[in-house]
């Protein structure tokens, strides 16, 4: 049986208005599009890098 992947919950706390288009695309890649939305994603180095790129717009709610 496969081991369950670690998951991370990310909440959008900032608006992408007047931000660089790459930051908007990163939010879309994180499955976020409105303030207050929460997305549950696999905890991978790629996702951590995306969170780091928009750390002023998101916060980590929960790590499992």
Curated annotation (Swiss-Prot):
It holds the Pfam family Ribosomal_L30. GO terms for molecular function: structural constituent of ribosome. GO terms for cellular component: cytosolic large ribosomal subunit. Keywords: Methylation, Ribonucleoprotein, Ribosomal protein. Disulfide bonds: none annotated. The keyword Ribosomal protein applies. The protein is methylated on either Ala-2 or Lys-3. InterPro entries: Ribo_uL30_ferredoxin-like_sf (IPR036919), Ribosomal_uL30_bac-type (IPR005996), Ribosomal_uL30_ferredoxin-like (IPR016082). One of its GO terms (biological process) is translation. PANTHER family: LARGE RIBOSOMAL SUBUNIT PROTEIN UL30M, MITOCHONDRIAL RIBOSOMAL PROTEIN L30. Part of the 50S ribosomal subunit. Belongs to the universal ribosomal protein uL30 family. This is Large ribosomal subunit protein uL30.
